[in-house]
Amino acid sequence: SKQPTYPIDSKVVTTVDQTVHPVPVSSTSPKLLPTEISKYSQYGYGLWQAGEGMALQKRLDIMAPGFSGAEARHEAKLLRFFTISDIHVSDKETPAQAILYGAKGGVSSAYSGVMLYTTHVLDAAVQTINAIHRKNPIDFGLSLGDTCNSTQYNELRWYIDVLDGKVIDPSSGAHVGTRTVDYQKTYQAAGLDKDIPWYQVLGNHDHFWLGFMPPDDYIRQALVGENIVNLGNLFVDPRGLESRGFYMGSIDGSTTYGDVIGAGPEKAFVIPPKVLAADPDRRSLSKKEWIGEFFKTSSG
């Protein structure tokens, strides 16, 4: 059957036309934890408004001293290209992540509500690129790395498949909520316009676990298992991935707002917490394997 799509607004603008500004949260609103997504709208969190556009900057600093362009008599377009970076397509249901570090604020890269919709955000960005391309053709695109959040095969395939315009199943493991939870539902990605070639760079999150630790055997095995990883404070503990003491948490994909599960001190759990199901597609990729997947694409 035909899968749903998520078309963007027909009016597509750039920062030359307008900018985006957050609406200040009322002083009477309570402070919310990042995980309290269900209360964001009620208390005025996450709202934004349009602001004035920004003029394009002339990079005269790369020209000869004293150059102003005043003597120029002819204009010509050299290249027109797009860049995307730090997309962090995330398997929010994986047992090997670090949600605990960000669930109460402080480390937004460890937890953010946007984790539920990373493939959808990328799909919207691709549609925006296509719309701009139709107005004024783009020569090529550059993706500058941190495509994935944590070296996982399924994260990389989601990324490539969104660019290729494939059907996207944004869930993993038990694939719960695929009929009832918005962020879990299968959908048809728009795909990047086939006339735009694109080039890829490897980022730290693409070959390090969470961007800063080479995955060891414990992490590699945890990724394809059910047990939520048990780690210490990786920021200060010299034992690194060999440290223990805290379960790092995961997301329950059967819940409307992506409830955090299995996060907290080891002593708070009678039984070690688990995700709903293991998934071999969560496996960690080596650099060679990661690069190899880009030869399995129908775009670019």
Where in this protein do the model-derived segments appear?
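Acidic, histidine-bearing metal-coordination/catalytic regions of metal-dependent phosphoesterases
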Residues: 1-140, 153-201, 206-299
